[in-house]
Amino acid sequence: MSLWDELILPAGTLDQLRRDASAERPTHAWLFTGAAGAPHRRAALIFAAALLCEQPDPADRGCGTCKGCVTVLNGSHSDFTHFRTEAVSISIDDARELVMKAQDRPSVGRWRVILMEDTERMPERTSNVLLKAIEEPPPHTIWLLTAPSPTDVLVTIRSRCRPVQLPVPAIADVAAKLVADGVEDALARHAATLAQGDAEVAARLAHDPAALQRRETLPLLIMNIRSISSAYAAADRLITLAEQDAAEAAAARDEKERTELLAILGITEGARISPSLRSQVRRLEDEQKRRAKRIQSDTLLRSMTEIQTVLRDVLTLQLNSGSALMNEHARDALAEFAARTSAAQTLEHVQALEVVLGRLRTNANARLLIEGFMGRFVH
């Protein structure tokens, strides 16, 4: 089983990506895009791993087990730079640092690979710094950019990149993959539905009962708000559980990555790490610290998006549209809530939540935003 098998994509799209990653001379710049739940970020990372995979047969690249793949996935490969930001915008200094790294020749792999997420946060003044490097990179450098959609990226940048637009997997396809991985059919369908087609989230829900219970109950907090104090309590509980969920996800992944890296380097757990290898371990630790903060903000954003599914279910019941509910497990509670509010009120809540989600993506004060939103449900 290779890394490519993780991705739930149309067969033609997946085959094309595999061929492109193993080509003698791949395109120098790529733009991976997809809506929330689409695997564009994971696909870009797997593409990077395949570019630096050590398998001699091009058809086998992206194996997921060689040193090249493992160190790309955990961020410790010396020829791979994985840039993500918590800031509202990507700074000129960030861009200049990436441009400098792009000039370095590969030290162990075939390519110097720069994976730049959050490209939609790049203002025009920053894009001007990157433009030349992306348009005419050194022959050994490949740029991989990610964003929610092509239109989120300045035209001067996206016009220089080969586009890879990936769809959100169908819920049935995500469920089928979970079943193939040994998950019971009903649980697989339930997890895939709650995850809204996000395969990574669905897998966690299917294998972690505590995470599944949090997902089933957390978005329903809004239905029990009766006072300002209960609104604050709901906001605090949502934030606390999102932080806990993120910490658990990061811890499990961090330990797995450290174990894999030590095995690749030939180091037994607890043994002294030689100075020549310590830099790779430190690089992994630094990457994990940066990623932990991002996981926390992404988890909180996802928690608020899950509340959005509750509001849409309520609106579905109020309008009697007959559409399937995303939170079918809570139909009775949703019906009771729908009966004591109006469709107009629910629509106002949906619109307010869209504003909150937009501001959360710009690193605004999450607690203030969520407390304000919860306060809307006070009767």
State each model region's role:
Residues M1-A50, G68-T71, P139-T141, P148-E306, ...:
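Charged, glycine-rich active-site and insertion segments that engage polyanionic ligands
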Residues M1-T119, E124-R125, I142:
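P-loop/Walker A NTP-binding region and its immediately flanking N-terminal helices
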Residues Q103, N128-L145:
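Conserved catalytic/switch belt of AAA+ P-loop NTPases
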Residues E117-P123, N128-E135, T151:
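Catalytic acidic motif of RecA-like/P-loop NTPases
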